[in-house]
A protein has these predicted regions:
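Gly/Ser-rich catalytic serine loop of serine hydrolases
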Residues: 170-172
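Nucleotide/phosphate-binding catalytic cleft detector across ATP-hydrolyzing
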Residues: 1-51, 58-167, 181-190, 194, ...
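A structural feature that tracks compact, well-ordered secondary-structure segments
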Residues: 175-177
């Protein structure tokens, strides 16, 4: 059995042998005898389609940093399959195959995550869910989907009796679930997250989105509001758009709560946050600062990052796979 986080920015697989991660991205180059030979020699993963080579995963990200005029392509956009990328399906299949391989036994279970339906745009998740299931099933597995934020809650709310609010901040979407004793009472997503930050930083600072992402993830600075450490122009832009994103998320949460019948929790509940976009230094300080400026309809006991935020959703998928197996 395995858990698989199918994120816009990263795919993460978890099983009894540990965790494996791959960037959900590709870089397209023209095919020549020399480039094909070099990629094979260096064991760089790629897919050949229509006489073009798609370099896959982490290597694509690294190549994009070296060749500044090359933009990364994404099989997914805003949490779902990218409708502008005709080669998304074979690229995704190669990424998934590289992480989980082919099933070693018949109908081995894989629980994979899908986003909640976004509340700020008209878009369904059914096609996205079906395509991922088709790819996973084609490798000999039996695939079952779970909501991304619920998966995060299974990993991060265990000490709270699986009760609280889980927020998964990925590259394409922010997903939220309110859980009580392991059951979801409300789940949804908003279509602004890490990629939205990259796009705005890139536009305002005159750099590529790949460069903006690299700066955002570098980890050599903090976006904490109370920090007096000097930031570069690009780092300041990252801070600005993180604050804007959190404000947007909290406003949408408040609006959703106001229009939905809320559960009556007997005690204050925690908010736990995970996902790659939550890993920037000082993020939790930004979230707490913006949270304190809002009227929240539930009493909150604490706000914290889950352990290993990048792999938490995949771990929750694996927990669900284990529960189903038993």
């Amino acid at each position: 059995m395995k858990g698989l986080d199918c994120g816009t920015g990263n795919f993460v697989a978890v099983d009894e042998n540990g965790m494996r991660l791959q960037r959900n991205a590709f870089l397209t180059i023209d095919k020549t005898t020399t480039t094909t030979r070099q990629l094979n020699l260096l064991k760089v993963p790629y897919v050949e389609i229509n006489n073009r080579l798609h370099i896959i995963g982490k290597k694509a990200y690294e190549y994009a940093q070296v060749f500044g005029n090359k933009e990364l392509s994404r099989p997914m956009s805003q949490g779902l399959l990218n409708p502008t990328e005709q080669d998304a399906f074979p690229v995704l299949r190669e990424i998934i195959l590289g992480l989980v391989g082919k099933a070693e036994k018949e109908k081995e279970r894989i629980v994979y995550c899908v986003p909640g339906k976004p509340i700020d745009k008209v878009q369904e998740v059914n096609y996205h869910e079906d395509v991922l299931k088709q790819i996973i099933d084609s490798l000999g597995y039996e695939a079952r989907a779970i909501n991304e934020a619920i998966a995060l809650g299974l990993a991060g709310l265990q000490t709270a009796g699986l009760t609280g609010i889980s927020i998964s901040m990925g590259a394409g979407m922010c997903n939220l679930a309110i859980m009580y004793a392991g059951m979801s009472t409300l789940e949804f997503s908003v279509a602004k997250s890490g990629d939205w930050i990259d796009e705005n930083v890139a536009r305002d600072c005159g750099i590529s989105s790949a460069k903006a992402q690299y700066i955002k993830e570098a980890g050599d600075y903090t976006i904490a509001p109370t920090s007096d450490v000097e930031r570069t122009r690009e780092q300041q832009a990252v801070k600005t758009y993180y604050e804007a994103m959190v404000r947007y998320l909290l406003s949408n949460i408040a609006n959703q709560f106001a229009s939905t019948s809320m559960p009556n929790f007997p005690d204050a509940v925690p908010i736990i946050i995970g996902g790659g976009s939550s890993m920037v230094n000082g993020f939790i300080d930004v979230f707490k600062d913006q949270f304190q400026q809002k009227q929240f309809p539930l009493e909150i006991s604490e706000i914290k990052l889950v352990d290993e935020p990048l792999t938490a959703v995949a771990r929750g998928c694996y927990v669900e796979a284990q529960l189903e197996e038993n």
